[in-house]
Amino acid sequence: MVGRLSLQDVPELVDTKKKGDGVLDSPDSGLPPSPSPSHWGLAATAGGGGERAPVAGTLEPDAAVTPIVPNPASLTHSLAAICSPRLCPLSFGEGVEFDPLPPKEIKYTSSVKYDSERHFIDDVQMPLGLVVASCSQTVTCIPNCTWRNYKAEVRFEPRPKPARFLSTTIVYPKYPKTVYTTTLDYNCHKKLRRFLSSVELEATEFLGSDGLADEC
């Protein structure tokens, strides 16, 4: 006697597949034993996306065994954002190159110290017969930034002594003084030379110029 399988019983076969494959192999089902998985069960699995939806309140086997390991790069970025160091200048050095080289040693050093008072120290060494004609330097520092700008220029001329020295005195009317003195010290061949310029003022009266006399 040959059994007949109707398509109306397909949902029931899918439900029995979820409960267990042993139900189809029982003698009461009237079907021969099936050594391979049911065709209807495979079709139902393929139509459902190939994966079984997890039940609420349960974990997958892989998720329950494997712990969640954070990304080291994300931890480093978060720690760097929290503990970002504040950049402050500590020391500064520079060198000056001379071309052509002088017959004797010439050194020019400059250093910057940053503290509560902010000192700037310059030290110039030169052979005999050379004097500093001009020296200009600019230091630009931006707080909390690694960018620094520094420009220095030194000019030497082979002059043993100053040829000319000019001193200008500006008298401010509100604070009158009688004597203004400017002193220039020059060291040549380790001999101290001093140049002194003095301006002496005397109170005078201008006839017919009362307004000018009041301003002076």
Curated annotation (Swiss-Prot):
InterPro entries: Refilin. The keyword tRNA-binding does not apply. Residues 1-55 are annotated as: Disordered. GO terms for molecular function: filamin binding. Interacts with FLNA and FLNB. Keywords: Cytoplasm, Cytoskeleton, Phosphoprotein. Detected in various tissues, with highest expression in lung, followed by spleen. Belongs to the Refilin family. The modification Phosphoserine is found at S6, S26. GO terms for cellular component: actin cytoskeleton; actin filament bundle; cytoplasm. It is found in: Cytoplasm, Cytoskeleton. Involved in the regulation of the perinuclear actin network and nuclear shape through interaction with filamins. Plays an essential role in the formation of cartilaginous skeletal elements. Disruption phenotype: No visible phenotype; probably due to redundancy with RFLN. RFLNA and RFLNB double mutant mice exhibit severe skeletal malformations, as characterized by scoliosis, kyphosis, intervertebral disks defects, vertebral fusion in the spine and longitudinal bone growth retardation. Chondrocyte maturation is accelerated in double mutant mice. GO terms for biological process: actin cytoskeleton organization; actin filament bundle organization; epithelial to mesenchymal transition; negative regulation of bone mineralization involved in bone maturation; negative regulation of chondrocyte development; skeletal system morphogenesis. The keyword Cell membrane does not apply. This is Refilin-B. It comes from Mus musculus.
